[in-house]
């Protein structure tokens, strides 16, 4: 279900704004997207895992809030991010 630390580090390196960046909206959204995708795969095989489904919904909501924030703050960075992540919005 959870993504490995190595995969998380790869995502951070790919989406960071500067060398020590771990908390920018782009990084947070990219990590959440990877976790959401992993949890979706888990829920495809374990359809009755309602506890994980609730966690998935919370992650989707958190990602939505971060995307809204980024869209208000910098529309160009927002568009580049959703294009690179393949998020339908």
Swiss-Prot record:
Keywords: Ribonucleoprotein, Ribosomal protein, RNA-binding, rRNA-binding. Disulfide bonds: none annotated. GO terms for biological process: translation. Pfam families: Ribosomal_S15. GO terms for cellular component: cytosolic small ribosomal subunit. The keyword Nuclease does not apply. InterPro entries: Ribosomal_uS15, Ribosomal_uS15_bac-type, uS15_NS1_RNA-bd_sf. Transmembrane segments: none annotated. GO terms for molecular function: rRNA binding; structural constituent of ribosome. Part of the 30S ribosomal subunit. Forms a bridge to the 50S subunit in the 70S ribosome, contacting the 23S rRNA. Belongs to the universal ribosomal protein uS15 family. One of the primary rRNA binding proteins, it binds directly to 16S rRNA where it helps nucleate assembly of the platform of the 30S subunit by binding and bridging several RNA helices of the 16S rRNA. This is Small ribosomal subunit protein uS15. It comes from Staphylococcus carnosus (strain TM300).
